[in-house]
């Protein structure tokens, strides 16, 4: 990569507090050849700004991995604001809903894959892949989706189309090439991933765009002009000398490779049928034969089929057990990886491979999929480690994995604002609701915000309803809310649309909310994952960006985890107090700009009520004469279906899906 300064950090702020020494140590360690480091940064010390400075010093492509979509979105917004002239991309799962293919042997129930793709997030994924191949100044903020298989990097590169003015290119040849790149010709519904032909003009909407199209103007067999144009009104925006057009699918492949892949699938099918027949599993042999032959016919005819990802090993011509191609391959050999909230993200990465292994094994054993489907998987942890180059584990509470590696730990405890860690109060659970209400009213008088964390979803729902009845502007942040909607809710909290946010496990790591002056932890003394020392330290830290920040633990005793969390908080607080006294500085309020959320507008309401209940058998559907009532019922069932899929209750999810389809047949959902 060029040594010129590609990354240009733009900010009115200068490193302060503990940031200068942390930046210097981290950069020097990398220059000395160290590959891994820990940045132990207390909440609110500006770890993201420190990382931005590291990126500017190292001048390398950077992958930032967050453990949930909310944090990924927040990091994306912050880094995009700091690097306005560089490419900052967003790569998360594009599924709004995903129910995997499954077979439940106990009831002999096969459940087809069912999913809903968010087109706008898919667009952002394509933009990330294209930027990594086209530029050196790229930062990608990703969820663990980055360790899941995408198309082969070499195939994607070979499928890239370069066009420039003056090129000799027959119009029909370009049409054929676009179809090979998975673009669909559509003269009526012109949208992302399609093209249309108007005389000597071909218009394309690339996979990484939506509002800006590409217009190729021919004069005979020569490209006379290339333009960007506004898809809405058709007006030309700029004339271009050349363009690079990436495939409409990340799973692009060429015809020759596809044919070789089909041969390999046929050979494996033959071997699997022989296996089933030898073991007297004739029904399984018949099922795998019918399914695979149908898929092969579709692959031969149109180059695609339902569940094509299950044949990815063959279509990429990989060997059994070989690591899948992922977004990480698009970074090349020299790049920086930031693992945000590493104490949560590392265990998440470790667990991805095992998550659905048994589900796929069932599909293979009972004749629904070929054994090669097992290679349609995320990276194993050792494969992920092998792909890393320079790594910073970023956390206020590093996990055991990082701490046992015996790598440098760089501490960042002093905040640029010189604000101290919150004071902690322990209060009894008796009359805790009345006490909490009093605290909320006190904080809202001072235009401050409140976070409340509970142990269960039911308790969060009940508490939200209770506070609403008391006229508190409260929102409930729960797992069913879509990733981009969560960012809107957090933004609305900062803007004052809500005074209070209630949640279970979504109010811990990384939420940057300087307006929050109070964190209330209910059932703080209960033992378990949600109340271990790391969780408590992280939760307390949500109030660490506010001068008057404090945490209230409602508990009837002090658990060992509480004791550790309290001691660590006060250890940091003491260091901060001593620094402030020595340097004669005074804590100041943080006036943090409220950034726009990711450039995708949510049409749905930011708050949805949770629906609970079980589906018992084939429940008879009520007739809905009112369209609004019918739509509400469908949405209610969709929520229940998603929840069932999340808990791997595939039978319940399939039953709900059938009920939804039956309702939709009686009238289109608006």
From Swiss-Prot:
Transmembrane segments: none
Pfam family of the protein (one): ResIII
UniProt GO MF annotations: ATP binding; ATP hydrolysis activity; DNA binding; excinuclease ABC activity
Domain Helicase C-terminal: 432-594
Motif (Beta-hairpin): 94-117
Subcellular location: Cytoplasm
Biological processes annotated in GO: nucleotide-excision repair; SOS response
UVR domain span: 631-666
Gene3D superfamilies linked to this entry: P-loop containing nucleotide triphosphate hydrolases (3.40.50.300), UVR domain (4.10.860.10)
Helicase ATP-binding domain mapped to chain residues: 28-414
Role: The UvrABC repair system catalyzes the recognition and processing of DNA lesions. A damage recognition complex composed of 2 UvrA and 2 UvrB subunits scans DNA for abnormalities. Upon binding of the UvrA(2)B(2) complex to a putative damaged site, the DNA wraps around one UvrB monomer. DNA wrap is dependent on ATP binding by UvrB and probably causes local melting of the DNA helix, facilitating insertion of UvrB beta-hairpin between the DNA strands. Then UvrB probes one DNA strand for the presence of a lesion.
Subunit structure of this chain's protein: Forms a heterotetramer with UvrA during the search for lesions. Interacts with UvrC in an incision complex.
Record protein name field: UvrABC system protein B
């Amino acid at each position: 990569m060029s040594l010129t300064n590609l990354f240009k950090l733009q900010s009115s702020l200068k490193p302060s507090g503990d940031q200068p020494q942390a930046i210097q140590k981290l950069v020097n360690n990398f220059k000395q050849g160290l590959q891994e480091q820990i940045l132990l940064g207390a909440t609110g010390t500006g770890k993201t700004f420190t990382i931005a400075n590291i990126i500017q010093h190292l001048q390398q492509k950077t992958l930032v991995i967050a453990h949930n979509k909310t944090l990924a979105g927040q990091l994306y917004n912050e880094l995009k604001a700091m690097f306005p002239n560089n490419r900052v991309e967003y790569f998360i799962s594009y599924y709004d809903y995903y129910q995997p293919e499954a077979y439940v042997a106990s009831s002999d129930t096969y459940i087809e894959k069912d999913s809903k793709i968010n087109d706008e997030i898919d667009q952002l994924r394509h933009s990330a892949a294209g930027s990594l191949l086209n530029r050196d100044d790229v930062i990608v903020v990703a969820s663990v989706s980055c360790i899941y298989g995408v198309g082969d990097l070499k195939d994607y590169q070979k499928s890239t189309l370069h066009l420039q003015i003056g090129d000799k290119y027959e119009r029909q040849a370009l049409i054929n090439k676009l179809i090979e790149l998975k673009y669909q010709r559509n003269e009526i519904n012109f949208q992302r991933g399609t093209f249309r032909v108007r005389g000597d003009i071909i218009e394309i909407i690339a996979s990484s765009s939506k509002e800006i199209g590409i217009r190729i103007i021919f004069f005979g067999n020569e490209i006379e002009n290339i333009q960007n144009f506004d898809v809405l009104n058709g007006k030309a925006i700029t004339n271009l000398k050349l363009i690079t057009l990436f495939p409409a699918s990340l799973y692009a492949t060429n015809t020759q490779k596809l044919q070789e892949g089909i041969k390999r699938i046929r050979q494996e099918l033959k071997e699997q049928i022989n296996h089933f027949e030898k073991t007297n599993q004739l029904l399984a042999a018949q099922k795998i034969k019918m399914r695979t032959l149908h898929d092969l016919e579709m692959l031969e005819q149109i180059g695609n089929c339902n569940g094509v990802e299950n044949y990815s090993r063959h279509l990429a011509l990989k060997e059994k057990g070989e690591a899948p191609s992922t977004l990480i391959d698009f970074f090349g050999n020299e790049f920086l990886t930031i693992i945000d909230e590493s104490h949560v993200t590392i265990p998440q990465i470790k667990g991805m491979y095992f998550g659905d292994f048994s589900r796929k094994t069932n599909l293979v054993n009972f004749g629904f999929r070929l054994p090669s489907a097992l290679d349609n998987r995320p990276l194993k942890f050792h494969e992920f480690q092998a792909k890393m180059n320079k790594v910073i584990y970023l956390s206020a509470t590093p996990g055991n994995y990082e701490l046992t590696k015996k790598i440098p730990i760089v501490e960042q405890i002093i905040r640029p604002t010189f604000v101290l860690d919150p004071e902690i109060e322990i209060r009894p659970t008796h009359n805790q609701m009345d006490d909490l209400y009093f605290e909320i009213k006190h904080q809202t008088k001072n235009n401050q915000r409140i976070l409340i964390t509970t142990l269960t979803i039911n308790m969060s729902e009940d508490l939200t309803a209770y506070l609403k009845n008391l006229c508190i502007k409260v929102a409930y942040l729960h797992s069913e809310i879509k990733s981009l909607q969560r960012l809107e809710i957090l933004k609305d909290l900062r803007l004052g649309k809500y005074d209070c946010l209630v949640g279970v496990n979504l109010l811990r790591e990384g939420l940057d909310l300087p307006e929050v002056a109070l964190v209330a932890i209910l059932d703080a003394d209960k033992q378990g994952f949600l109340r271990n020392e790391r969780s408590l330290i992280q939760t307390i830290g949500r109030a660490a960006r506010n001068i008057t920040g404090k945490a209230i633990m409602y508990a009837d005793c002090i658990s060992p985890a509480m004791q550790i969390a309290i001691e660590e908080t006060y250890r940091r607080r003491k260091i901060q107090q001593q620094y402030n006294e020595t340097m004669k500085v005074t804590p100041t309020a943080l006036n943090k700009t409220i950034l726009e959320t990711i450039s995708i507008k949510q049409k749905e309401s930011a708050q949805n009520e949770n629906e609970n209940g079980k589906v018992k058998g084939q429940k008879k559907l009520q007739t809905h004469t009112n369209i609004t009532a019918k739509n509400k019922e469908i949405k209610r069932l969709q929520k229940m279906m998603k929840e069932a899929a999340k808990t791997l209750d595939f039978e319940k999810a399939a039953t709900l899906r059938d009920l939804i389809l039956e309702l939709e047949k009686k009238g289109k959902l608006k």
